[in-house]
């Protein structure tokens, strides 16, 4: 890493070179921008899917006769490739088969599924078919029903243990239980949330530790003293006090409960009291009575009574016998076991836990309430923390996380007896590191084991889960009177995803230590407490529910088939007379995989995080793939007003972009990954940093999670940091950050430094030059509007870029990349053939004028030539909005900031007619129209050119089959596909019967159902695709044939279209001015766009001004370098690379310019620069098929480290613009008058984008159209050919102007006066006098509502005649039409 003083030529690809102004050069390789979900889904296919299914096997029948084992998964190849899937509207998918075996223990037979003879032609895989699974493409998308979709990653709270001041337990969609105080929230990945807390509603001297648990039916929550739960888990009261060193909160918890050994027999519940009385009376047969789960407690009480009798007899006979004390100890131990079982029973009943769990001997080896409760909490399948949760818990509950700046209250020894730290030591970083190191090496002597009243192995409590660490520290560093034990977990096993008893102990210790300021509260908005769920986790969670349902169906079938697989017939005397064989069991008859297929289909079609891929342009597609959402299942609602969740957090630095987010209700909930961010195996976001050792920046790059970053001091990379040739920091102090605080630090104390200044923002934000000079709100708009840019016919890369354009275009998936290093053997408009170094040939088919999800045009343009050498992953063909392998979202145009007759008032934009004529901002839109030929109950529909009641003019472009021809120019109403449908059974009149008898072939019982071009769809037919069952295509049920017609629209820029820059500067075109009338420079160069100068200061996006000046300097620099090359052959050779043009084109250009110079008699370079203007150069460019847009000299100014004020002055001086004199303002001449403007005007080259908010998609007109069935008013919206709403305020406006007749028409015949509009239509057709409007339906409806209130309503006309409103129907009955209609027949379908 080293600092660069000014600039250098940086070559991004063979066709893209820029003058790079970055002040910090680094060799850090940016990761692939689109492979996060690809790697995640590949992990799911390779590992997660098989592991998920294997976790449910083996499955056994209730009597263990049948066992189904899982042997693995098999995958089939896709039936069709990606292109076929898109074209045929099918899913690009693979088949998943399970290799299962059925073992019959009664006969010893092993059965495996085989492919059936019936399906042998279509399936070559043995095993049980589970589902078809969509396959991810090389570009990271799924093709589902021919549509490209993508699954957004979800960011949620990570499972783990959190210390909070307030938490809540969700009981239902509308009910929740809020708890405040010192709260420890145990948040699992699978299972119910638990709250261990000390309430703040009591005085601290009266408070004790409680736990809040949600019941099994999730309808309520129960509170228990924490010691009750610990006793139910098998800890005695003495053991609890020993672990927590008689802590006051724990002591009060023991006093608050009823399960105390001293008075348990006196204050016991009636059940135990009755058992004691009956066993003391000698009724020993009660041990086996009652339900099975109660037998354990009965047995314990019975054993206790026997010991009690033996103790009583021995103490009376031999009071001093040592055996008396042993009996008392045995009785105490047995009493602890009774308390454990009784407390467990109490909690099981309170939480409504089903006793059916005792039937599963794998989960409950012992038939007891204690075993049932332990299986509920300590089994991974019941209560799963997940790998991320275990990582968080292990980190949170370590002792070393809580004892910083505390004083040791005891001597700390190693196992060999050596003193590690003595009592009274203040624990700072060095001492804590010693403890960590000794603990990792298992050398320290502070590990203890929980002693249980039961056998831990009998309830799946491993010995490792009972180990804990304990260390005493003083509460106050100044007063050593009070000490407390800090309890933590020991030797955390990251593979154990279940919660353990030591986790409970450590969590309780955390809660009781928090009031003593030992430990810290968690910030739930910190990224260390959030994790990202990628597609493998999202689909696994949905798939798990489908497998669970399949398992339940399978067990039900095994239960039916269990026992003896033979039927018995019994006679009247009850004797078996015959045994009949049942149908033989097979795996395929047992497995029902429909639930799995349903959840997969629903996931890719209806899941909240599965979206249509944004195909607007390459940036929008790539940003879509890097987006993360806080919404979705289990996430945050967009209506949630919590601002803390949406706000920027310091831990997001380098991980989540602080700029790119939507502006509406989703602000802060939809986010974008930062440029270099990665996701680790646990789902935590990571940012890269360079390691600093003793003040020297090394080349070692580490990716840190937010939690790890909090442990280090990190410096910002900046041009202000002085570094020598060995990368040693020379400054005495540099800016660094530790967590949320910034300060000046000695370089020797700094651990890491940023890898690049732009690592903090997303790829979209990193494309904005001079981002540091824009207001944050405008930067957000600029980032979002870049994703709305419409791909143009002639895209050009920005003159002023940031250096990210090539990387984004290459990783977007829309460009064609070389599959290997080699030589181009063949290239044309449709394919490229590359021969690799090993001699293997690769042929790549280019995409030509295909439609995207957003109706934009996909087209590949080759960049390579035959014989050219290419390297692997090099861009060999441009895609949409890509020019010479760089992202090209718009055009470089000459912009001036001045007013122009008020046409650019506010944000309106005035443009030159040149942008229209030269197709500078022209785009292509491709619309798809589909016609399906269906099989109906009345017969099959037919594709035909013989359409009834359609003129030849409307069928002029149809071929002999009735399908539109490619290249036809179609307009609204033209037939695209001729189709007729059979009519239903109708009664035929005598006349029709006679006509049919005379002309049997001319009468067709069909109706016209042709596909016609809708309103606003005018264009040229670019492609027609035809699929039919007869040709072997797979179509949907009931579809015989399907035709897709693609119509291309060439949309030139026009008034009403929206334009935008990259700095949040946007506006709508208000005027297209002839080139001759536009203001122009003194050399005659006309301005392309006029912007309002008042739109800059208040918006505070000054970056656009810097961009404009730098762009104009680069534009003029290219012109000067071109003229200089005419006088210096060496400069001519270097110019080809600098302006990114082939040498042969440049030679022709220089030859033409030399001819101009010679003809004018210009002797030297200075004279040529002074006298050759843009018009002279434009003539030469036109002769060789180029334009000024091809001559731009491109620069790269990376954000936060790019062009500064001095650099800008230098390049403007180099371009001859004299910034000291002109200040970037130039003399403009009014094209209409020929007079100069009063003062110089700021102008320059700015990058302008055409957004997808085009007027053609919004404006429309309605003459005749559909009406609402209910209100009889016209429908609304362009899609329904609706009308414009004339609301209350518009009525006021016409009333104010006294436009009574206009208002009457709008409220009657143009709205819902049914009779009046029919009469008006007939009058127009006949040329008759215009009738008077009638009463609108809405007024008639009002009268009916008033009548519903028991009010009598009458109409009184101007002539004082009166009519009862009861005689007025809301709609006129059929057959009551006006006489004007007698001669007309109307088709009222849809109106």
From Swiss-Prot:
Gene3D superfamilies: 2.40.50.100, 2.40.50.150, 3.90.1100.10, DNA-directed RNA polymerase, beta subunit, external 1 domain (2.30.150.10), DNA-directed RNA polymerase, subunit 2, domain 6 (2.40.270.10), RNA polymerase alpha subunit dimerisation domain (3.90.1800.10), RNA polymerase Rpb2, domain 2 (3.90.1110.10)
Catalytic activity: RNA(n) + a ribonucleoside 5'-triphosphate = RNA(n+1) + diphosphate
Keywords for the protein's UniProt record, in alphabetical order: DNA-directed RNA polymerase, Nucleotidyltransferase, Transcription, Transferase
Organism domain of life: Bacteria
A Pfam family of this chain: RNA_pol_Rpb2_7
PROSITE patterns the UniProt entry points to: RNA_POL_BETA
Top-rank EC class of the record's enzyme: transferase
Enzyme Commission no: 2.7.7.6
Entry's transmembrane regions: none
Oligomer and partners: The RNAP catalytic core consists of 2 alpha, 1 beta, 1 beta' and 1 omega subunit. When a sigma factor is associated with the core the holoenzyme is formed, which can initiate transcription.
Functional summary from the UniProt entry: DNA-dependent RNA polymerase catalyzes the transcription of DNA into RNA using the four ribonucleoside triphosphates as substrates.
Protein name per Swiss-Prot or TrEMBL: DNA-directed RNA polymerase subunit beta
Naturally occurring in which organism (per UniProt): Mycoplasma pneumoniae (strain ATCC 29342 / M129 / Subtype 1) (Mycoplasmoides pneumoniae)
Lineage: Bacteria, Bacillati, Mycoplasmatota, Mycoplasmoidales, Mycoplasmoidaceae
